[in-house]
Amino acid sequence: MMSGYNGDGVSSLPTRTQSPLARGAHPGAVLLSPKRTALGTLGGGAGGSSAQLMSPSQHSLSLNDILDQQAHPSRVDSSSAMSLDASIHQQQHTSGVGMLSPLLQPQASSISVKTAFLDSFGSRPSSAIGLQHGQGQGPDGPQSATGMSLNNSNIMVNFTNDVNQLCTWMSMLTSAQQNTVMDNLLSSLNEEVLQHTKLKLESLTNSGYLSPSLRPIASPIPSRVATLETSTQSASSAQLPGSLMLDSILSDSAAAGAGSTNSNNTNMASHSLAVNSMYRQWSPSPQMNSAQPMFDYLNDITRPRSAEPSRLRNGHTSHHQNGSHHIAMNSGNGAPPNSHSSTGHQVSSQAGGRFSNIKPQRPHSPTSLTKSTSSSSNFSEAQSPAAQPTSPGPSTPNAASNVSSSSNMNPKSLCDPKLLKNIPAWLKSLRLHKYSASLNGKSWQELIDLDDAILEDMGVSALGARRKLLKAFAIVKECKERGLVDESAY
């Protein structure tokens, strides 16, 4: 071998125009490149002449030796240069077309190199192992084509896993962290990739695309720790080594939790420790006490003053007492507004009707409110002292809310001449048509002078119905005194 090399090996070497390297360059310079600088020079700068290099399986250096020499460049000696020259000499005596190394193929060099860098943190990449195994069959056998197809599929699978892992990791970052990643990522992209990204952003902006809202980082999914604990051994072949590095950012104790799989108790303890560590790192500590309900922590938070029910009730009570023309003070008996209410009515008004008392004041104008206030005052003064304690009249807040909630309790509808002449229709407008038989024999002039005791004697047994009728009678009576009732109603 050495004699053949000394005899005609020099004459068979490629000239300077054919050589992929400069004349002054060391023959083993390609092996001294720590990354893909020399590989890119061979794959892109040499052009067609780079296609003459043989695969690593045909010379004495294996992929392990290449990786070892990249990690320790000082160990390169003259034997590596001689082996490279011998491989170039052997290439001239072959059939002319050899199987290229996958690391030097133009269409797969970038993918394989990037995948090797992503997967080489914990162990050797499965793609590189598959490449060596597939190329060991020889350049002429039919098994080499099958090996190449399997290698290409492995490269694409690993590349897809890398992309999915990177996208998943990016989605779990905050906006500031994503900006930092993009600043470092854009500086390493080619110009054509940047142009493509620019066009993509412009098209998305013109189409009205809105970026999806990021979920809060304060609550990482606790089940991810359990997944790492239980499926590390079963999914180690399908899961990339880089995924553990990306997931380890979530918790410092993920590795410790993944290794404790001796018993169920150990798994549960490590799982709870990992969850506590995650919540301690990303968000405030949650309520982990099972004896305390999850919603009890709301009592410790300072509530805004606008949401205090007690303040709202007190403010509404003061509004009724001070702002509504002192309706309750004009009753003359000094009884509290809710003295007639039972215990159940008070509970329901506090629980269900907490905010309903504010609504009745909206549909009424100040004029109608003044009229109703004055009419209720006049009516309360006309009542007898004996009837007032049992039935205080419609001057209470609950009665006023029930009356004003109806759209028909206004002077215009109550003083309609057509309705005043037809008492059943007038009662139907108040939704009290069930008492038409009891009040049908009287005119509206007689009805407005009735009091609570007379209505009860006439058959109006419901207290709410009597209050509603007395309120309507007071409004019609006030309109009559002011001359607002049409003459056709008489």
From Swiss-Prot:
It comes from the Eukaryota. Pfam families: SAM_2. Keywords: Cytoplasm, Nucleotide-binding, Protein transport, RNA-binding, Transport. Residues 313-323 have a biased composition (Basic residues). GO terms for biological process: nuclear-transcribed mRNA poly(A) tail shortening; protein transport. Residues 365-384, 396-410 have a biased composition (Low complexity). Residues 1-29, 71-90, 305-410 are annotated as: Disordered. One of its GO terms (cellular component) is cytosol. It is found in: Cytoplasm, Cytosol; Cytoplasm, P-body. Residues 418-479 form the SAM domain. SMART domains: SAM (SM00454). Residues 76-90, 330-351 have a biased composition (Polar residues). InterPro entries: SAM (IPR001660), SAM/pointed_sf (IPR013761), SMAUG/VTS1_RNA-bind (IPR050897), VTS1_SAM (IPR037635). SUPFAM superfamilies: SAM/Pointed domain. One of its GO terms (molecular function) is mRNA binding. Its main location: cytoplasm. PANTHER family: PROTEIN SMAUG, STERILE ALPHA MOTIF DOMAIN CONTAINING PROTEIN 4-RELATED. Belongs to the VTS1 family. RNA-binding protein involved in post-transcriptional regulation through transcript degradation. Monomer. Binds to RNA. This is RNA-binding protein VTS1. It comes from Eremothecium gossypii (strain ATCC 10895 / CBS 109.51 / FGSC 9923 / NRRL Y-1056).
